[in-house]
Amino acid sequence: MTDTPDQHEHTHEHEHHHEHRPLDYTEAVEAFRAEKDDYFKNAGAGSPIPVAEREAFTGLPYFPVDLALRFDDSVLEPYTGGEPSNFQIPTSDGRLRPAHRAGILAFEIGGERRVLTAYTFDGGDGESLFVPFLDATSGSETYGAGRYLDLDPEDDGRYTLDFNLAYHPSCVYDIRFSCPLTPAENRLPIRIEAGERLSPTIQVQTLDAGA
């Protein structure tokens, strides 16, 4: 069992090459997804896909890659909300995990400014950010308790907020995994049609959204 946000981060593009040319962004994301699918199918006890479903597993479904939902050079702004900076975030197995509201990340979709709170955990490096979120696809095309983003700083200290890398927590598929529940403050009132979708062929666990 793990109490980390997830065992498989989606924050790094892989430097693969085909016919001696660099992959473009869409190809890089698709290559990363293929590697994750291979891990889920073949990782043995490390895979969250139920053993009985692994043989038939052909990969997770995703929204098409959309560059409009990748926000480069995002600055971590100070958190100015009314909630305490230090708090206990509930997990899928009923525990509480010490967390910190590190700041907010702002972005614009459809001409409107949106924000998500970014979190860090006790014992982390203090720079890597955990950004869980809910949106208008949650509970239908995507998991009802939200999806995750893991962000590492660039060399200049800024972040890339890329919804194409949004993923479901492992506890979606296997209750052995302990996953933080998405705080209600990170509910977006719009559809984020990027990242992982729910698979119609894999049974998912049930969690409440908006901790």
Sequence positions of predicted segments:
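Extended, aromatic/histidine-rich regions of cofactor-dependent oxidoreductases associated
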Residues: D3, T26, R158-Y159, Y167-A211
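Conserved "landmark" site that anchors the functional core of diverse proteins
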Residues: P22-D93, Q203-Q205
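Terminal leader/tail segments of proteins
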Residues: L67, P84-F87, G126-E127, E154, ...
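Short helix/loop capping segments that flank catalytic or ligand/cofactor-binding pockets
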Residues: T80, L116, S140-T142, P169-V172, ...
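Acidic, glycine-rich flexible loop segments
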Residues: D135-Y167
